[in-house]
Amino acid sequence: MSDAATRAEETSEGHSSSAIGLMVGAVGVCYGDIGTSPLYTLKEVFIGGYGVQANHDGVLGVLSLIFWSLVWVVSIKYVIFVLRADNQGEGGVMALSALARRAAAPFGRLQTFVVVAGLIGAALFYGDSMITPAISVLSAVEGLEIAFDGLEHWTVPLALIVLIGLFLIQKHGTARIGILFGPVMVLWFGALAALGVYGVIQQPEVLQAMNPVWAVRFFSSHPGIGVAILGATVLALTGAEALYADMGHFGRKPIARAWFLLVLPALVLNYFGQGATILSNAEAARNPFYLLAPGWALLPMVALSTLATVIASQAVISGAFSLTRQAIQLGYVPRMTIQHTSSHEQGQIYIGGVNWALMVGVVLLVLGFESSASLAAAYGVAVTGTMLITTLLMGVVIWRLWKWPLWLGVPFFCVMLAVDSLFFAANLPKVIQGGAFPVIAGIVIFILMSTWKRGRQLLVERLDEGSLPLSVFISSMRVQPPHRVQGTAVFLTARTDAVPHALLHNLLHNQVLHEQVVLLTVVNEDSPRVSPDRRFEVEAYGDGFFRVILHFGFMEEPDIPAALRLCHLNELDFSPMRTTYFLSRETVIPSKRIGMARWREGLFAFLLKNANGNLRYFNLPLNRVIELGTQVEI
């Protein structure tokens, strides 16, 4: 986990106030999505066209399905097991993919599968990042329709105002108001629990739903729609992936404690309270969440619901920023400008391109679907797809990293896979009912990410063709030494055994070399952070030539000047006014050579042209950089 989270969790072992503070923070960041699911889950089950009757058996059967889904998928799978699969404390589909890829290193095909699975999981997460704000805020604002007649036409405009405002403030950061997220969400879960108790007291028989017999009986008595209902009940699990993705901020224990001590009891009570309301009045199925509340509490609950959904949306947006930074470092996404919005919290970042793309997607979803009930069909595919990818990657971790015995690992993995596959299969019919959006968004994002990754590989391969071996070049410099000028020249190169093109071009045109020539390679590791003692490798070739390899984790910012200043070697001088950085700027030309389809080559050329260059990405000083261009056919 991050250094701050590690220190905080260690401190929490001896100080209850620190432990409570971490739990409250985890509630505000990790549980917003799953915490707002009661707004729309039961409503979708009973009015979503599945044919479930709002009678005694139907209500108890659905409640039992939701209860045991929360217990198995969230409590057992995610909280108890998946949270243990941390990549040096970091979680999320990208971190898990990097961990599984490292574990699968001896198996080429398995490693390829892990990479593809990780890309699909990340692509689905971006689709989920668009749907969550739209359905959550719409669900909250729809409470006004219960409080006041004739406000149906105002639901979409009000939701758009809230959502657009949320995206507009992202550039300025949420550090100041972020401190309120935890307390507000604690209040939200307290309200969920209180409303649930209020409903359960009126119909205590709903507590029978904790008996799994009701879920089994529901399936047996509804053979035609039993599996389809899973496509709706899975809405109660939305946000389970966020627990894992945000682990680096708080650590495993605070997230787990918050779940078992507050979030799970509040969710179960509220779902059971809604079920009690439906048992008392079948008409309440049209919006059981708001109809559970007493009349005097309706408007306060609309206001609190809106706050909770905004916080949930903020957490998802921040998660998209964080995932993008990881993907950039791991080489799956073109480099983008990353702006820090807080001087105290390293994780508070803003990526403009991602923010505006999400905003456009969210606005189109709200305008296209117009209600949370319509959006619910699109939601399940992204959620269950991501859960299935996590299970597949966990299988690799259990086998290769944890080395569980087969008698334990195989049955556990098979049960996880069967449950997630059942949920995913139940949601596949939704693709033709509105669920195509996350699938299309996922396909587009997967194509972009895989094209960028493959294009970068082809680019390096083409640059390597005809490259001059470093040993040959240094030997030739000794035979015919060029004129040397004062200072240090740093040439960035992806290869550690070949001469950079920028060095050859500089020597060809300027006929000079610096006193010190550093061939620099930056390696992005599969781990989130690299310890200072592993940051750099230095090798001296003699005659003023040096090879330096810098290592960065996928959660770190590659600041080359700062890292080079840590290279403690007497012969090297990296003082700012004596160091010049030479970069190559490649222009890709699509060709008929074997590599990628022509349209993908054109797409890669476009992405490369619009990506941030090495200058910004590596934090190089503007007045000490020389860029040399070259054209490359791929």
From Swiss-Prot:
Subcellular location as annotated: Cell inner membrane
Domain of life: Bacteria
Record's catalysed reaction(s): K(+)(in) + H(+)(in) = K(+)(out) + H(+)(out)
Broad class of where this protein is predominantly found: membrane
Regions crossing the membrane: 19-39, 62-82, 113-133, 150-170, 177-197, 225-245, 259-279, 291-311, 349-369, 379-399, 406-426, 431-451
Membrane topology (UniProt): Multi-pass membrane protein
Cystine crosslinks: none
Any one cellular-component term (Gene Ontology): membrane
GO molecular function: potassium ion transmembrane transporter activity; symporter activity
Keyword Ion transport: yes
Listed GO biological process terms: potassium ion transport
Keywords of this entry: Cell inner membrane, Cell membrane, Ion transport, Membrane, Potassium, Potassium transport, Symport, Transmembrane, Transmembrane helix, Transport
UniProt record similarity statement: Belongs to the HAK/KUP transporter (TC 2.A.72) family.
HAMAP family in the cross-refs: Kup (MF_01522)
Biological role: Transport of potassium into the cell. Likely operates as a K(+):H(+) symporter.
Name assigned to this protein: Probable potassium transport system protein Kup
